[in-house]
Structure formats: C-alpha cells, structure tokens
Swiss-Prot record:
CDD domains: Ribosomal_L16_L10e. The gene is rplP. Part of the 50S ribosomal subunit. NCBIfam families: rplP_bact. Residues 1-13 have a biased composition (Basic residues). This is Large ribosomal subunit protein uL16.
Amino acid sequence: MLQPARRKYRKEQKGRNTGIATRGSSVAFGDFGLKCIDRGRLTARQIEAARRAISRHVKRGGRIWIRVFPDKPISQKPAEVRMGNGKGNPEYYVAEIQPGKIVFEIVGVPEELAREAFRLAAAKLPLRTTFVARMIGQ
C-alpha cells in the first residue's frame, strides 16, 4: 500500500479540504482518465483496491498511472479509551481529493476496455467519478 517513507512530523492537523483541483485536473500521461467530481478523502486501501480492479480487467495490456498519493496521516484512539490523554496514533494515510482531480490514467487499451476498467475501479471508491479522454493536441 502507498504511504510516505518518512515524515518530518508523525501527526497532522485535520484541516479543511476546500477549493477545486487546479493541478492534476487534466489527462497528462495516458489516453484516458478517471476524474473525481466530489470532494473527499481516498485511503491508501481504497486506492489499492481500485488499482487492482483496473489491473485485473485490463490483464496484461496497458499502463496505469496513479495520480494521487496518500500523504496525510489520520490518527485514531484505540477502542474503549477515555477521552483526553492526547491525540491517538496514526492509523492510516489518505489523499485529500478536490473536485476535478484525475485519480487514475491508462494508456495502451481500447476506449471500451478503459471505460469498463474505470467503472469497476469507481465502485471501490467513495467519491463520484467520471471518465475523461485526453484532449486533441495535448
């Protein structure tokens, strides 16, 4: 699963996920992309599950790019622990997603196959997504 190799600080404040994606909002590497149209978080497990769904469907063909990286730690306290006594330990990592962000890209497969692979991957993600193709001249 994806997670940072090292971090300067183990824990991070919650923050607010606002605005729309300006960077990473167009297909840059592949021919087709899976674009999020909702705001939210993708965990490393969700990204990996979607990647596996795409890989299984396209079999040996094509090349896949993951355009997001889960670099934000989410901390949790253990079950049945009283309130207080500081912040919990980091349990998993998430990628903050703004509307318009491309999550996956693929090249080397026909459009119908890419569409179906992204449909299967979208079922693994908690956000609404749409299929996009590379613009002519990009």
